[in-house]
Regions:
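Catalytic alpha/beta active-site cores
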Residues: 1-96, 114-130, 138, 156, ...
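Thiamine diphosphate
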Residues: 136-152
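Extended amphipathic alpha-helical segments enriched in small hydrophobics
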Residues: 97-104
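Conserved, mostly hydrophobic/aromatic
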Residues: 107, 158
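Catalytic core of nucleotidyl cyclases, primarily class III adenylyl/guanylyl cyclases
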Residues: 133
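Carboxylate/His-rich catalytic cores and anion/metal-binding grooves
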Residues: 111
C-alpha cells in the first residue's frame, strides 16, 4: 500500500510481502486470535483512487499476502478470519454504504471460490472504516465536526467493526 498509495516504501515489494507472510504464519501458529495485518485501501483512496479502485487494490494486496502464506503450506482457514482491512469513508453516503456492503460479498466470494475456505469466519470482511484526511478542511474546522459525524454515520450503516475519525482540527 505504501508503494501504491504514496509512491514510497521502506522495503521493496517482494521482501515486504515475505515479511507480512512471516507475520501471518507466526500468528497462525502462535497467536491465532491476533490480527496479523491490516490490509489498507485507505491510503490508496487518499491518493486519488475512486471507491471501486480502493476496494480492488485492497483485495489485490490481501490476495498477494494470502498467496504468499498458502505457498508456504498454510490453509486459508488458518489465517483468513484474522485478516483485517482499513478502508476510507469519503463522499456520498449511499455510494459508501454500497461499497462496503458489496465488498463484504466480494471478499467472501474470493476467499471461498479462489482459496477454498470452509469456515464462515474466513469469509468475514473485518474492517476499520476511517474518515478524515482529504475530506477535512483547514479553513473551516467547525464544519469538520459535521463531516466527522457524517463519516461516523456511514461507518455505522456500513457495518464497520471499528471506525477511526480525525479530530475537527486535524485537517492536512
Amino acid at each position: 500500500k505504501e508503494f501504491i498509495g504514496r509512491g514510497t516504501w521502506f522495503y521493496p515489494v517482494q521482501p515486504s510481502i515475505k515479511l507480512v507472510g512471516d507475520t501471518i504464519e507466526y500468528c497462525a501458529e502462535h497467536a491465532p486470535k491476533y490480527s496479523p495485518v491490516s490490509v489498507c485501501g485507505y491510503h490508496i483512496r487518499e491518493s486519488g483512487a475512486n471507491p471501486v479502485q480502493e476496494m480492488a487494490y485492497g483485495f489485490c494486496i490481501a490476495k498477494a499476502y494470502a498467496d504468499e502464506v498458502i505457498a508456504r503450506g498454510l490453509d486459508v482457514d488458518e489465517f483468513a478470519g484474522r485478516l483485517s482491512f482499513n478502508f476510507n469513508v469519503f463522499g456520498n453516503i449511499f455510494e459508501q454504504v454500497a461499497k462496503f456492503r458489496a465488498g463484504r460479498g466480494l471478499w467472501a466470494k474470493i476467499v471461498k471460490e479462489q482459496y477454498g475456505a470452509r469456515k464462515p469466519e474466513s469469509e468475514w470482511l473485518r474492517m476499520l472504516a476511517g474518515g478524515g484526511g482529504g475530506g477535512l478542511t483547514f479553513e473551516q474546522p467547525e464544519v469538520n465536526i459535521v463531516r466527522g459525524a457524517y463519516y461516523g454515520l456511514i461507518a455505522a450503516l456500513s457495518g464497520a467493526q471499528t471506525t477511526a475519525l480525525c479530530c475537527f482540527d486535524e485537517a492536512y
